[in-house]
Regions:
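Cysteine-centered motifs
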Residues: 6-7
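Glycine-rich beta-strand-centered segment in the early N-terminal region that forms part
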Residues: 40-54, 68-110, 150-152
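Short, well-ordered coil/turn residues at beta-beta hairpins
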Residues: 53, 250-252
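NAD(P)H dinucleotide-binding glycine-rich loop of Rossmann-like/cofactor-binding domains
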Residues: 105-190
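Mid-domain Rossmann-like dinucleotide-binding core that forms the NAD(H)/NADP(H) cofactor-binding site
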Residues: 153-237
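Glycine-rich phosphate-binding loop and adjacent beta-alpha segment
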Residues: 256-316, 354
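C-terminal hydrophobic helical "lid"/dimerization subdomain
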Residues: 260, 304, 308-354
């Protein structure tokens, strides 16, 4: 057979070969399987990221518990990620991905509030099969969602850019709603997970707030957070948390019981920043909220500007050491989810490494 024909046939057969990566796949309630999956498909306007590190978010836990109708099994979940781009104009660059993909054309996108875009989708939630989440060796992302990181920012640490942006956005929204500086406020942070700790670090190390109380029923997490900023660390039922005693409350939990406590303990004229999404409904003391002019604000994700500023915050180490992050192998990700579920994990953030 002619040599040129042989080469052509080899090229055709090679181009049809299925390229396989490893991924952690959500397959059902409290079930994750580490298995082979097809590589993401190269698409116009997108680039392929070789994942370096990916963080487990509270919303990933919601999916794990079967409580997120937007994340339908089987699905590669995960959206907090850092890595190296494999193709296109960013090829070879160390980057993080903004997982919130928006239309860029609506009134929100054109006015700096991209996170409220009615057409938004999220990596690891509601994208097509071939472009799913980041608990994998590879993931595809629109080029406009790619953010380069400076060489001195470790990619392991860069992986928490997304939750840090969530916390920064919440703190800035709270700051704008207050009638006095954050540095003068008595602050309650409900929840000793990653968002709770990141809010506290931004409040204390960037905003000069040294009067923070953090509450959580999990003693392991609470004692771990106590290593990283000065404050009081208590159980939600502790006597330290008195009615009408806090200028601002950050609810990073989002349970009915945490909302009830937030409205009870906030001062007249105070501010509640609601970040957590665990329970979507429940009782709330609207009488107090009305008669005492309490400001209740839900905060969702972050703007593009918040995301850019977060990379600078991490690169400049403005929130201190990040040795509270715990790293696990992606292939052992199912075990990490189980430990977060049963409360035996003390770290506020687990990051998975492929």
């Amino acid at each position: 057979m002619d040599h040129r024909i042989c080469c052509f046939l080899f090229f055709i057969l090679s181009s049809k070969r299925k390229i396989i990566m490893k991924a952690l796949v959500y397959t059902g309630v409290e079930e994750l399987i580490y298995r082979d999956e097809k590589d993401p498909v190269e698409t116009k306007g997108e680039s392929i990221l070789k994942v370096h590190a990916s963080g487990i978010c509270g919303s990933d836990m919601h999916a794990y518990h079967g409580k997120d109708e937007r994340r339908i099994a089987p699905l590669i979940i995960g959206h907090e990620v850092s890595g190296v781009i494999q193709n296109g104009k960013f090829q070879g660059k160390n980057v993080v991905l903004n997982p919130l993909i928006t239309c860029g054309k609506c009134e929100y996108c054109t006015n700096g509030r991209e996170h409220l875009c009615p057409n938004r989708v999220l990596l690891g939630m509601n994208r097509p099969y071939e472009r799913q989440g980041v608990f994998a060796e590879l993931v595809s992302s629109p080029n406009q969602n790619i953010y380069e990181v400076p060489d001195h920012l470790n990619l392991n640490e860069a992986a928490i850019a997304e939750p840090t942006a969530v916390a920064l956005h919440a703190v800035l929204i709270g700051e704008n709603a207050l009638k006095k500086p954050l540095s003068e406020c008595r602050t309650l942070v409900q929840g000793a997970g990653a968002i709770g700790l990141l809010c506290s670090l931004i409040l204390s190390k960037i905003k000069g707030n040294n009067n923070i109380v953090m509450s959580d029923p999990n003693k392991l997490r609470l004692s771990n957070c106590a290593k990283y900023f000065d404050g009081k660390f208590v159980n939600p039922a502790d006597k330290e948390i008195k009615n009408d005693s806090f200028d601002i409350v950050f609810d990073t939990v989002g349970l009915e019981v945490s909302r009830q406590q937030s409205i009870s303990v906030v001062k007249p004229g105070g501010v509640i920043i609601h970040i957590g999404l665990t329970q979507p409904s429940g009782e709330f003391n609207f009488r107090k909220a009305t008669l005492q002019e309490v400001t209740f604000i839900g905060t969702y994700c972050y703007t593009n500007k918040d995301f850019e500023n977060t990379i600078k915050i991490l690169a400049d180490k403005k929130i201190g050491k990040l040795d509270w992050i715990e790293y696990r192998e992606l292939k052992k990700g199912a075990e990490a989810f189980k430990q977060i579920h049963d409360g035996s994990c003390s770290s506020p953030k687990i990051v998975l490494l492929p």
